[in-house]
Amino acid sequence: MKINLDRTSSGFCIGVQGTIHVAEEKLAAKETLFSLGDVVHNEVEVKRLENLGLTTIDEAVFKELQNTSVLIRAHGEPPETYATAERNKLDITDTTCPVVSKLQRTARLLCQLGYQVIIYGKHTHPEVIGINGHCSNRAVIIKHADLSDPEELKTLDTTIKTALISQTTMDVPGFYELKTNLEKRFAESDETAGKPWTAIRDIDITAAMTGIGTMPRTVFKDTICRQVSSRNKKLHDFALANSCVIFVAGRKSSNGQVLFGICRSANPRSYFIEDIEDLEDSWFRDNEGSPVESIGICGATSTPMWLLEKVAEFIDGRFNHRDA
């Protein structure tokens, strides 16, 4: 039984790497450190950091803190979080992912330009909450690219200037499906808005802000992180190349759900686990009861490499040694 560990398209993305590195440095220096929300959407990694001294808090506790240090994770936060920190004299360690920071700025400027902002994303995801905060909490958040949820469309106004952006970890095909469906929806109410929406760049937004340029009524900006989305094809091929796949991620990980779906579509014998306790012996046998030829082990952008290695070592020790 060959065990293949994916080291090229699994493990922490750059944004999460930065957050974990900063947290480890501060904890190693024995500093008191609170994290506003789970530092990463992986319970195993959160527990490891909490064992080093990190304390995870929710928003209610955060608002009561005074004169201490708080870590802002890679997902980012809305402006009101920083206002609270200033009032309470909190020392903020801001590890917002640079890609997310750029997206927050884009959302803020689009709102200032008078655009209705649509965010392709998950309503309760912390990144989306942060982006919406930069739109004064007035953005239209749409998770279903087919526009199948009427609740998501209640505040959508098809008669005004509109800009479409995305949570950084959403799927690229879904984003463009949503764009197409919005074009159709807007065309139903106004034929002049029925033409394809215009892709915009940072320079277009800057020109509009300074008054030296203008932007069309309906625009979109693909803000999906390519370091994340580029993993899709690689994981698809990785899943195809193995007899079965063990996908390691936290249940809360949005990116994990997307990537696992890709693995499962490529290889039906793909299994989602958080840690080794979730493994089942039957997964590693073919229909005749013999060991499968190969096992692929991979994970999300919020899955630490040490955990993937732990899973690989456990499977190797349990099945290869037992079958020898």
From Swiss-Prot:
InterPro entries in the record: LytB/IspH
Cofactor annotation remark: Binds 1 [4Fe-4S] cluster per subunit.
Residues annotated for [4Fe-4S] cluster binding in this entry: 13, 97, 225
Recorded catalytic activity of this chain's protein: isopentenyl diphosphate + 2 oxidized [2Fe-2S]-[ferredoxin] + H2O = (2E)-4-hydroxy-3-methylbut-2-enyl diphosphate + 2 reduced [2Fe-2S]-[ferredoxin] + 2 H(+); dimethylallyl diphosphate + 2 oxidized [2Fe-2S]-[ferredoxin] + H2O = (2E)-4-hydroxy-3-methylbut-2-enyl diphosphate + 2 reduced [2Fe-2S]-[ferredoxin] + 2 H(+)
Cofactor or coenzyme needed: [4Fe-4S] cluster
Active site: 127 (proton donor)
GO molecular function: 4 iron, 4 sulfur cluster binding; 4-hydroxy-3-methylbut-2-enyl diphosphate reductase activity; metal ion binding
EC number, as in UniProt: 1.17.7.4
HAMAP family per UniProt: IspH (MF_00191)
Family label: Belongs to the IspH family.
Protein name: 4-hydroxy-3-methylbut-2-enyl diphosphate reductase
Species, as recorded: Chlorobium limicola (strain DSM 245 / NBRC 103803 / 6330)
